[in-house]
């Protein structure tokens, strides 16, 4: 179960096991409804009109990522996506955004954490939550508010959380996705997708790497309209990290410490996916090889790929594949 993919797949199997044994599984929202975020402002501060536009963008981005079982949170400011949550969790994502802001000379002021459930997420066993640590992290990162999907997110230690938010001048608000239900894409199943992957060089991907590449390519394509997602890292059908704007090298380094426990073997596993061939450099190849990944997939043709980088990949035993065409779903 653990090796089969993301959290959603694992948890659905766990729930199914207990239900088959005659148990009724209930969620925290049913057991403690007073902890559930309701629509509207929960504290004293209020979101601005600009904040509301960012909130809808953040909700849409997480919705777009839902089929790939990644991301319950994003940090966004003035329409710019600053961080996308991977398997590291919300608090570490906020801290990462804060570090990037402090390092930048033109860092934006304000900004929002948008937190929502993924489409088809089973809220009985995996309900997103915010709490005091979320508020503290948002304040340290210079954010102005937290927008949480109404009826789908919990507030842990509600009184403490809201008191700290009020003291910091941070709004906490329950919001709804304005998009119709028909806008929610269905779950992505890499094994049912047919995609032309063209190897460059003598190293060929194994079947599990092909599936990782297919899922990663679909993930970055889903984010193209948001201007982010130039790099993704996928291991055993699990998307570990997606780039906002930190660059391919930083994204791969970040993902290196986020591997699933089922992937901690000496065998090379996982694929780094790049939207553009220009991102393929000798330095990146070295980072990918040292991190123990099996290869690199590129979402356009190989014309812009560095010959030196391709030669380095061959020396390191990494496969390189390109896939400039869109995928299609098969019937298998």
Spans of model-derived segments:
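C-terminal binding/interaction regions
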Residues: 136-175, 179, 286-329
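N-terminal glycine-rich phosphate/adenylate-binding segment common to multiple enzyme folds
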Residues: 1-32, 181-183
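Short, basic, helix/turn surface patches
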Residues: 51-62, 166-187, 209-216, 317-332
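Structural signal for hydrophobic packing residues in well-ordered secondary-structure cores
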Residues: 15-22, 62-66, 101, 142, ...
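Noncatalytic linker/hinge segments flanking ATPase motor cores
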Residues: 15-18, 87, 116, 121-124, ...
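Generic serine detector
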Residues: 4, 18, 48, 117, ...
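Conserved mixed alpha/beta catalytic, RNA-binding, or beta-rich assembly cores of soluble enzyme
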Residues: 4-8, 28-135, 187, 191-205, ...
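Residue-level marker for well-ordered alpha-helical positions
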Residues: 11-12, 132, 159, 282, ...
